[in-house]
């Protein structure tokens, strides 16, 4: 295990080139054996994360919640749900992570709360037109008796985005908006009280030492004036140009938040989850007076094909560079099919939350998917800018496809009546020890989602010290990325390769990624990293190589 290296206060712009590791708390490590990961479990694994070589952690929500959407339905933004631990546990996590030189980013969910949030409970008990209802998007229905929704908006999880409430006398009443599950009512960001609520949330966690926030559904908090009908879509995506996404008013919210963070010093940061295309529009979220990072979902959604990769990299560098920001690269997270599976088939939706399951018409090629995923990760980590890793990808974990219907938890699966599988498959608890109960997730064998037998082979303890393992590949990639300053570097395209090859120089490192089916010539120089064994002077298919040229 690495020695403790207390967090340095510099550089202030650390996020420009950092590699951040996403932890989905309920699936990371379970200290009390109840089948759900928790904060003490995370603390116990901090030495392993530090040993991997990342710079910071992003934690998905651990706040008080009914867990209808795995914590993204928040009932109290300033407390910890008992299933994850206590507020003192969270404070200990922040302190201990800093002792290991790891910064901590936490989620903030500003678009909606839980329907169990005290504000919403008060709104249900109040009358139409009241101060309490004005904090949310309550509206009168259409039709003679108001029995039709106020507009035709659809939930991202399936079904209508409106639910009707019963008034205090039992009569059918107003409708409230929920772009996600009915248990997640949307705030009305035209209300100053909502602004004040989130000022207090940010300062609460900044006072406890967090280093920044990942902002959930950052592009959704402002809705179009008058709530007009949108285009009717069977599966409304998170990033379409509907009247509830990417409205101009969102930027004022984050301009204020930026000022709040800057009052705590120059090294606090905001990262946007904004499913906005083209990237030139996404880049608006990282202008100098707004956020510091925005996940590059255009890159995530790109196939492992040279022409497509060159195009999205060029577009990314131009779009984000145009506002003075590096790109924030990402391939997997808790909302999308893991890229070790996604790259093994042309069928799987790149976006969320469609998912893949046992009744999906095409089954991915697991070996091909892992081979491509290793190559894709090596390509991503060689690019200038910052990058995010999702727990388990450094073990080569695939999407878990064969989860029985009666074990699923995903709201999408139930709202879509099983037509869409959603995100359970990427959220299965990760394996630490091949021969332990629940593969080391805990000591009891309990697991809130079932783990496949294949996880034994992929467990961390099976990969430590194996030079061919995905874990050791990631450790090498992160070590050389840091040593060679690739995150702080710049990209120069290299000529002389076939159309199936992505090749560029970043400083003194040449990066060659063969996305095709045929071997390609390897440049001269010292091989720092290869994602597939090199037997001769050629680079095999679906392989990325880093070569030191000077």
Annotated model-derived regions:
Residues 1-526, 530-550:
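Active-site and adjacent substrate-binding regions of carbohydrate-active enzymes
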């Amino acid at each position: 295990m690495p020695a403790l290296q207390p967090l340095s206060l510099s550089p202030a712009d650390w996020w420009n080139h950092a590699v951040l590791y996403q932890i989905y708390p309920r699936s990371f490590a379970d200290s009390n054996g109840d089948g759900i990961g928790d904060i003490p479990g995370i603390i116990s694994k901090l030495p392993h994360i530090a040993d991997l070589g990342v710079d910071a952690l992003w934690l998905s929500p651990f706040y008080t919640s009914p867990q209808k959407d795995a914590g993204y339905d928040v009932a109290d933004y300033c407390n910890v749900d008992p299933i994850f631990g206590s507020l003192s546990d969270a404070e200990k996590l922040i302190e201990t992570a800093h002792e290991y030189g790891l910064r901590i980013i936490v989620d903030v969910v500003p678009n909606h709360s839980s329907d169990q949030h005290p504000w919403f409970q008060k709104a249900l008990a109040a009358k139409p037109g009241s101060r309490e209802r004005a904090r949310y998007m309550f509206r009168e229905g259409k039709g003679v008796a108001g029995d039709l929704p106020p507009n035709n908006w659809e939930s991202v999880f399936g079904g209508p985005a409106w639910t009707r409430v019963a008034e205090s006398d039992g009569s059918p009443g107003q409708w409230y908006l929920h772009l996600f599950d009915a248990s997640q009512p949307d705030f009305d960001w035209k209300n100053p009280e909502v602004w004040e609520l989130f000022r207090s949330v940010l300062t609460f966690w900044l006072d406890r030492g967090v280093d920044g926030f990942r902002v959930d559904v950052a592009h959704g908090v402002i809705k179009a004036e008058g709530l007009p009908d949108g285009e009717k879509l069977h599966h409304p995506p998170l990033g379409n140009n509907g009247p509830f996404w990417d409205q101009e008013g969102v930027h004022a919210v984050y301009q204020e938040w930026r000022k709040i963070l800057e009052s705590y010093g120059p090294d606090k940061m905001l990262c946007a989850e904004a499913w906005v295309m083209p990237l030139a529009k996404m880049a608006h979220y990282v202008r100098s007076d707004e956020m510091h990072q925005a996940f590059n979902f255009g890159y995530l959604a790109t196939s492992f094909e040279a022409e497509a990769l060159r195009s999205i990299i060029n577009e990314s560098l131009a779009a984000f560079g145009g506002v003075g920001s590096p790109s924030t690269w990402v391939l997997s997270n808790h909302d999308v099919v893991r890229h070790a599976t996604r790259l093994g088939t042309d069928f799987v939706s790149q976006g969320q939350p469609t998912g893949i399951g046992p009744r999906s018409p095409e089954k991915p090629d697991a070996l091909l998917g892992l081979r491509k995923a290793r190559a894709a990760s090596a390509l991503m980590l060689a690019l200038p800018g910052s990058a995010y890793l999702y727990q388990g990808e450094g073990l080569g974990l695939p999407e878990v496809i064969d989860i029985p219907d009666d074990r699923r938890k995903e709201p999408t699966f139930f709202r879509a009546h099983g037509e869409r599988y959603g995100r359970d498959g990427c959220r299965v608890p990760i394996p630490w020890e091949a021969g332990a109960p629940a593969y080391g997730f805990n000591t009891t064998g309990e697991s809130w989602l079932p783990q496949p037998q294949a996880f034994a082979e992929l467990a961390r303890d099976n990969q430590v010290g194996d030079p061919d393992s995905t874990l050791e590949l990631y450790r090498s990639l992160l070590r050389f990325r840091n040593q060679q300053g690739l995150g702080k570097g710049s990209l120069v395209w290299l000529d002389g390769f076939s159309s199936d090859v992505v090749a560029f120089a970043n400083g003194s490192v040449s990066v060659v990624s063969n996305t095709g089916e045929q071997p390609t010539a390897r440049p001269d120089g010292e091989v720092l990293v290869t994602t597939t064994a090199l037997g001769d002077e050629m680079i095999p298919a679906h392989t990325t190589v880093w070569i030191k040229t000077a």
